[in-house]
Amino acid sequence: LIMGHMVNAIYQIDEFVNLGANSIEIDVSFDDSANPEYTYHGIPCDCRRWCTKWEYFNGFLKALRKATTPGDSKYHEKLVLVVFDLKTNSLYNYQAYDAGKKLAENLLQHYWNNGNNGGRAYIVLSIPNLAHYKLITGFKETLKNKGHPELMEKVGHDFSGNDNLDQVAKAYKKAGVTGHVWQSDGITNCIASFIRGIDRAKKAVANRDSSNGFINKVYYWTVDKYSTTREALDAGVDGIMTNYPDVIANVLNESAYKTKFRLATYADNPWETFKN
């Protein structure tokens, strides 16, 4: 996946997909009552990016639904997966369940159209804090209570805090998650990637490829340079999050990579570990 980073204004959906992204990441900020309120990142954010673009969350969901509903005038066939970067650090731990409940209610109504020919993209709920694992429980139980447990087939999970992978596994156990796991690793583009290195991403890939690992897919962020793109592909990641989708697309076209990698389509299962 080429994952467009920080797509928080509606017009940016077209912009990033047209540059080559088949996935986008959206920041979701919450109000004091744990309602998802805006698609908004805020300051500070990645270097060479405008941090303060925003929409109302439900307005963005409606636009996203159009972009991922076949037959709609705004439809993008290649946009297959959406990561919601949930900014839950503004909430108390005890609010995590409510945040999940309200997120599910909003998505059900405005994105999935109450289960009636809604948007088709796969969704990854990315949570920054392991202590907020009950967000997953709240989300899952709400879809079940509303009569749409089948929509969980479209939902995957990520803990984005760069935590120790053993701790991540424990949080999933508490949340009752046994699949659909994307593991993120990375750092803001303001810090050169070689300072932090790619070791943790390699550990995540090793977990993914082991017989008893809990990870299905690994993505690395935020990659804007040709050299870092090659390094991430060499490590065997499944997705690269970027501010410049065209850079990643160009590298994937290089002779060293174009026989080994291809862009995911809707026919690919994002929860299934790719076996060489």
Swiss-Prot record:
Q: Which residues are glycosylated?
A: 253
Active site residues of this protein:
5, 41
Instruction: List, in alphabetical order, the GO biological process terms annotated in this UniProt record.
Output: killing of cells of another organism; lipid catabolic process
Q: Which Pfam families match?
A: GDPD_2
Catalytic activity from the UniProt record: an N-(acyl)-sphingosylphosphocholine = an N-(acyl)-sphingosyl-1,3-cyclic phosphate + choline; an N-(acyl)-sphingosylphosphoethanolamine = an N-(acyl)-sphingosyl-1,3-cyclic phosphate + ethanolamine; a 1-acyl-sn-glycero-3-phosphocholine = a 1-acyl-sn-glycero-2,3-cyclic phosphate + choline; a 1-acyl-sn-glycero-3-phosphoethanolamine = a 1-acyl-sn-glycero-2,3-cyclic phosphate + ethanolamine
Protein family membership: Belongs to the arthropod phospholipase D family. Class II subfamily.
Give the EC number. 4.6.1.-
How many cofactor units bind, and how?
Binds 1 Mg(2+) ion per subunit.
Q: Show the disulfide pairing.
A: 45-51, 47-190
Q: Which InterPro entries match?
A: PLC-like_Pdiesterase_TIM-brl
To which species is this protein native? Answer: Loxosceles deserta (Desert recluse spider)
The entry's keywords: Cytolysis, Dermonecrotic toxin, Disulfide bond, Glycoprotein, Hemolysis, Lipid degradation, Lipid metabolism, Lyase, Magnesium, Metal-binding, Secreted, Toxin
Q: What is the protein name given in its UniProt record?
A: Dermonecrotic toxin LdSicTox-alphaIB2
CDD domains according to UniProt = GDPD_like_SMaseD_PLD
